[in-house]
């Protein structure tokens, strides 16, 4: 598998350098510091970081997940609405990659936040949805981790005979399968499918010994005498990087090139805020996730946020790095019965859609 090595953001290594693109202006006055009202009730002035385009009248159904990345910043500040005032933007909440797969399968979405494993599953038989990856929201590090209850367990090697809960089809599931396979424990550990909101209850009822999960459930388990023994950053070191991506249907993307150009500029601004002004971005994260500002800032340290310029490079959309990672993910999931079968030749390699990124970086 191909291991991708983007620059680590502040808190886990050096902060990403700012993308000095003339098309992106400094965003000022967008965030009201200390704002606690839900963004759906936000009545402040909407500010677009680029020249708004009222000629775009696209109707877009966009799904989001409670993951601390630029997509939440974009949603909270209503940047898409500000930059495309005549477009019809509908935001839908999804709780997991499995929910996203079902929604794409029923043609209920145009664009969605989705993990690298679920998007591969959606593109594979029997669903075989024609999806394109249009943005990398983050590369997952310590934000997804294996938390165990027994204090005597210090490593994955101690987990033989234990039961681990994880949302099936998620990036956490992929990381867990990778780690178990590397340790030779695939047949020695019980793995059960639990949604994130069911994991804490199963933990408290002693139905599971451990869980590979993300925030806020991760912190809840740690508060219940749990401790971390492994993370998705370690799985990436084994050649299995995981991502939170944004994907869209090929039909929607092909039919709406101007929308995709503006959408890409807006996502780039969300990422810029995370890397250059993390305290400002954390205000949006705190509102969307319903957590304290300080806690929101800490959440950001578990992820890497590739800039627009980095995403345009050979390691991602400008070369075959992302395509190779998606292909490797599919091949691994097929060996672990995570998907029924591999898609036809070329499907995973053609999933990255870099046209809009290339256009706005010219």
Predicted regions span which residues?
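C-terminal motif of bacterial Sec signal peptides marking the signal peptidase cleavage site
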Residues: 25-29
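Short, surface-exposed acidic
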Residues: 88-89, 187-189, 290-301, 339-348
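Pocket-lining segment of extracytoplasmic ligand-binding domains
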Residues: 118, 188-191, 197-290
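Bacterial N-terminal signal peptides that target proteins for export
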Residues: 3-17
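Bacterial signal peptide processing site
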Residues: 31-34
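Conserved C-terminal helix/tail region of periplasmic/extracytoplasmic solute-binding proteins
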Residues: 326-362
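Short, glycine-/small- and polar/acidic-enriched structural segments
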Residues: 36-186, 191-193, 209-212
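Secondary-structure end/capping motifs
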Residues: 255-336
């Amino acid at each position: 598998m191909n291991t991708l090595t983007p620059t680590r953001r502040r808190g886990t290594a050096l902060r990403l350098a700012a993308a000095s693109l003339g098309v992106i202006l400094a965003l000022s006055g967008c965030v009201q510091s200390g704002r606690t009202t839900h963004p759906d009730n936000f009545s402040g002035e909407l500010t677009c970081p680029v020249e708004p385009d009222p000629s775009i009248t696209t109707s877009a159904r966009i799904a989001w997940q409670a993951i601390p990345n630029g997509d939440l910043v974009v949603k909270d500040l209503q940047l898409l609405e500000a930059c495309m005032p005549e477009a019809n933007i509908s935001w839908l909440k999804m709780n997991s990659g499995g929910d996203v797969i079902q929604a794409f399968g029923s043609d209920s979405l145009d664009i969605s936040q989705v993990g690298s494993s679920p998007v591969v599953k959606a593109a594979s038989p029997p669903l075989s949805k024609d999806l394109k990856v249009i943005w990398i929201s983050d590369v997952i590090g310590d934000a997804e981790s294996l938390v165990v209850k027994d204090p005597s367990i210090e490593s994955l090697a101690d987990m033989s005979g234990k039961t681990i809960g994880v949302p099936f089809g998620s990036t956490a599931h992929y990381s867990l399968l990778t780690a178990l396979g590397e340790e030779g424990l695939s047949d020695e550990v019980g793995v059960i499918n639990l949604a994130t909101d069911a994991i804490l209850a199963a933990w408290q009822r002693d139905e599971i010994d451990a869980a590979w999960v993300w925030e806020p459930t991760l912190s809840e388990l740690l508060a219940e005498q749990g401790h971390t023994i492994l993370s998705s950053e370690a799985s990436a070191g084994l050649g299995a990087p995981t991502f939170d991506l944004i994907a869209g249907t090929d039909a929607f993307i092909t039919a709406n090139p101007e929308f995709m150009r503006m959408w890409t500029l807006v996502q780039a601004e969300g990422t810029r805020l995370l890397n250059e002004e993390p305290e400002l971005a954390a205000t949006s994260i705190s509102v969307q996730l319903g957590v304290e500002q300080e806690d929101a800032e800490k959440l950001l340290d578990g992820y890497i946020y590739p800039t627009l310029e980095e995403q345009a490079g050979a390691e991602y959309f400008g070369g075959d790095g992302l395509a190779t990672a998606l292909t490797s993910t599919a091949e691994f999931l097929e060996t672990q019965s995570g998907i029924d079968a591999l898609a036809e030749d070329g499907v995973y390699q053609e999933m990255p859609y870099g046209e809009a990124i290339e256009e706005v970086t010219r």
